[in-house]
């Protein structure tokens, strides 16, 4: 007989006719935690206190739009019969890579207009981005998405997971691997690594490039476990291809900047407005 396990209610709170969903709450929580981390570090690095608040005003909506656009482009068959569903964000369906593209483009334009170094902003933000991603993945958990292969309950219990996680991995009569959790934990570990690298006083830009490499390696591996993924054509997983490109590009940029640009050190108090390119 099939087990009867009720999933977590996707609605965080109902305010009259307005429903606020866990998905949105957890994404905004990740943004808030990341913002306060970046704000605290930016002041230490000699940036104006309002820098990241001003950046967030533009980066947040643009990132959400680009994340949704990225997802829709690679999953158009899901929306073709009902195009208005493109705007149903409460049901999930945004791509982190799309959000990062939007955020980076916004930060480049913002830095240029403010006379700041993009690389300095990116270095300050790197651990904050990862912690935001780690928290945001729990929105996928509530929505019962970003999961891996079929497993047994015994398999999940063997991972010493609490029942509330195991039960949420019970989807349409089957238990699945919690790949959302793997990525969330990988990102938390990445935050620790980046905070340690911050003390190593790398060259400007190298902390952000470390983030790109760390996240991309983890995403490549975990993407191979997922059952819900975006494809280019019939078999090429979009996130894995982009992860390879990002790792190669980050390493190439690291070498190029170290050998020819020779940017200042991250902890150099005068570096905030230098090396704008």
Curated annotation (Swiss-Prot):
Assigned GO CC terms: plasma membrane
Segments traversing the membrane: 18-38, 54-74, 91-111, 115-135, 177-197, 205-225, 236-256
Membrane topology of the entry: Multi-pass membrane protein
Pathway(s) it belongs to: Protein modification; lipoprotein biosynthesis (diacylglyceryl transfer)
UniProt entry tagged with the keyword Cell membrane: yes
Key word Cell membrane present: yes
EC numbers: 2.5.1.145
Subcellular location as annotated: Cell membrane
Database matches in InterPro entries: Lgt
Keywords from the named record: Cell membrane, Membrane, Transferase, Transmembrane, Transmembrane helix
Top-level division of the source organism's lineage: Bacteria
NCBIfam families xref list: lgt
Family indicated by similarity: Belongs to the Lgt family.
Primary role: Catalyzes the transfer of the diacylglyceryl group from phosphatidylglycerol to the sulfhydryl group of the N-terminal cysteine of a prolipoprotein, the first step in the formation of mature lipoproteins.
Protein name in UniProt: Phosphatidylglycerol--prolipoprotein diacylglyceryl transferase
């Amino acid at each position: 007989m099939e087990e009867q396990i009720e999933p977590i209610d996707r609605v965080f709170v109902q305010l009259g006719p307005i429903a606020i969903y866990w998905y949105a709450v957890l994404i905004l929580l990740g943004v808030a935690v990341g913002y306060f981390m970046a704000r605290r570090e930016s002041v230490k690095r000699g940036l104006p206190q309002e820098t990241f608040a001003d950046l967030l005003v533009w980066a947040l909506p643009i990132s959400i739009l680009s994340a949704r656009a990225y997802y829709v482009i690679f999953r158009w068959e899901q929306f073709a019969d009902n195009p208005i569903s493109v705007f149903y964000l409460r049901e999930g369906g945004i791509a982190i890579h799309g959000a990062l593209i939007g955020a980076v483009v916004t930060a480049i334009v913002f830095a240029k207009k403010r006379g700041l170094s993009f690389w300095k902003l990116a270095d300050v933000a790197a651990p904050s981005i990862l912690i935001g991603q780690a928290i945001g993945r729990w929105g996928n958990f509530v929505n019962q998405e970003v999961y891996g292969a079929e497993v047994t309950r015994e398999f999940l219990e063997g991972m010493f997971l609490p029942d509330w996680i195991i039960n949420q991995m019970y989807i349409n009569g089957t238990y699945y691997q919690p790949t959302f959790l793997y990525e969330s934990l990988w990102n938390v570990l990445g935050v620790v690594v980046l905070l340690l690298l911050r003390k190593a006083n790398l060259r400007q830009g190298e902390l952000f490039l470390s983030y790109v490499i760390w996240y991309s390696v983890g995403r490549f591996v975990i993407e191979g476990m997922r059952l819900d993924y975006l494809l280019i054509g019939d078999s090429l997983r979009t996130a894995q291809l982009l992860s390879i490109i990002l790792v190669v590009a980050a390493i190439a940029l690291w070498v190029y900047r170290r050998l020819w640009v020779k940017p200042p050190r991250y902890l150099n108090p005068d570096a905030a407005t230098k090396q704008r390119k």
